[in-house]
Regions:
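Short, low-complexity N-terminal intrinsically disordered segments enriched in polar/charged residues
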Residues: 1-30, 134-139
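A solvent-exposed, acidic/Ser-Thr-rich amphipathic alpha-helical stretch
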Residues: 3, 21-75, 80
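Short, surface-exposed coil-to-beta transition loops
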Residues: 62-63, 99-104, 119
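Exposed beta-sheet edge and beta->alpha loop/turn motif
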Residues: 83-110
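Short coil/turn motifs at secondary-structure junctions
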Residues: 84, 112, 122-124
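Low-complexity, intrinsically disordered terminal/linker segments enriched in charged
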Residues: 117-139
């Protein structure tokens, strides 16, 4: 396993299993930028705030890496997040419902750290699982 993939896996361990947002910061290069598919690009510190919001909403959050590969200076990871909605998520009160959320991340690495991240999560499915948006009939 390369140093770049090791760093990305460390991120998933620290955030997704240990819930240690302070330690996660070491995985990111100074000035790192994160792109969510449904939000403007943000610096790492704003990303950390989003992470804290999700950990507050899903304190039993866990993650499983399903696929991962490296190409050049990029590490691509497909992961599945799980948890129980026991805290507020934005303006959504706790529902007590379990969730599974698929995610795809492309991390551009520089100096063994994440310099830029493109993160796509299945927000529609998440909202359906929480009962905020109805799921299509028969699903």
């Amino acid at each position: 396993m390369s140093a770049n993939t090791t760093t990305v896996n460390r991120f998933y361990e620290l955030f997704g299993r240990q819930h240690d947002l302070d330690a996660v910061e070491d995985c990111f290069a100074p000035g790192a930028i994160v792109h969510f598919h449904d939000m403007p690009a943000m610096p790492y510190m704003a990303y950390k705030q989003v992470g804290a919001m999700y950990l507050g909403a899903f304190p039993d959050m866990g993650v499983v890496i399903e696929d991962q590969f490296e190409a050049g200076d990029k590490v691509v990871t497909r992961a599945v997040w799980s948890g129980t909605h026991t805290g507020p998520l934005m303006n959504i009160p706790p529902t007590g419902k379990p969730i599974l959320n698929n995610e795809l991340c492309v991390d551009r690495m520089a100096g063994g750290k994440i310099a830029e991240r493109w993160q796509i999560s299945d927000s529609l499915s998440l909202m359906q699982q929480l009962g905020v948006i109805p799921a299509p009939e028969g699903m």
